[in-house]
Structure formats: C-alpha cells, structure tokens
Amino acid sequence: MAASGQKYYIENRVYYHDTDAGGVVYYASYLKHLEEGRTEFMRSRGIDVAEYAKGGTLFPVVHLEIDYKTPARYGDTIRVYTKPEKIGNASLEFSQEIRRGEDTILKARTVWACVNVAPGGSAAKTLLKPIRVPQEIRQRIGA
C-alpha cells in the first residue's frame, strides 16, 4: 500500500564531530541525520515512537540503502527530507534525501520492521516478533 503525503524536512547543522580527517562528513554520521529525519517525521504526524517502545512495540531499521552524491562539510546547513513510500503488513518504507541548498548530498531508502518484544523478553535479548503496523500509524501517515 503506497503512503501519500509530501516530503517532510528538518534542518540540521553539520558539526565538527560529524566530519572525518578529510574535512567532510564521515559517511556513518549521515545515519544520525537520517534517523532524526524519520523520528521527527513521525512526531510531526502525532506519532511518538518512544511511547510505542514503552508498550513493547519497536521499529528497528532492517534495511538501508544510501547513494552518496557529494559531501557535506563542517558548518553546512542541511535539510533532511523524509517521505513514507510504503506501509507493509509489518514494515514501513521511507525515501529520504539530504540536501544543502539545491545540492543533493545523498539519497536513501530505509525500511523499519514493526516488532513486539515477546513476553518475558527484552530488546537486548532480541526476542522480537513481527506484528502488524498499528492502525493509528497507518492513518496518520496517510496510507
């Protein structure tokens, strides 16, 4: 089922701790920005992922693809765009872009699984069971 809606974005600054010895953003640092984009997208739709976690429903990233186009640098202001693409039975797929002005820094596709901590288990023990994406999330994302 395709999710409708426009791309949502947050604006972030690139800090020194994001960069590597070459003065550009270290590739793994982008993961933090992508996560913040997805989390804030959900929050903008009235969905608090942390509240779901308290009830035992988690949304781990199970797939991530990134195409790097051009580097961001210390001091840059970047926008992290997030758009829901598909809601499966037990998964959510997002397309994301990080841009600096008109320049595309990267394009990404991320898949979250929707899982519940099994009775007596914990996330640390990885006793996780796939569950259907809650109806509230389906409605608020627009699918």
Q: Which residues are covered by each model-predicted region?
A:
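HotDog/MaoC-like acyl-thioester-processing domains
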Residues: Y8-I10, R73-T77, E85-A143
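Hot-dog-fold acyl-thioester-processing enzymes
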Residues: A2-V61, V117-A143
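Hydrophobic beta-strand-centered segment that forms part of the acyl-chain substrate-binding groove
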Residues: F41-L92, K107, W112-A113
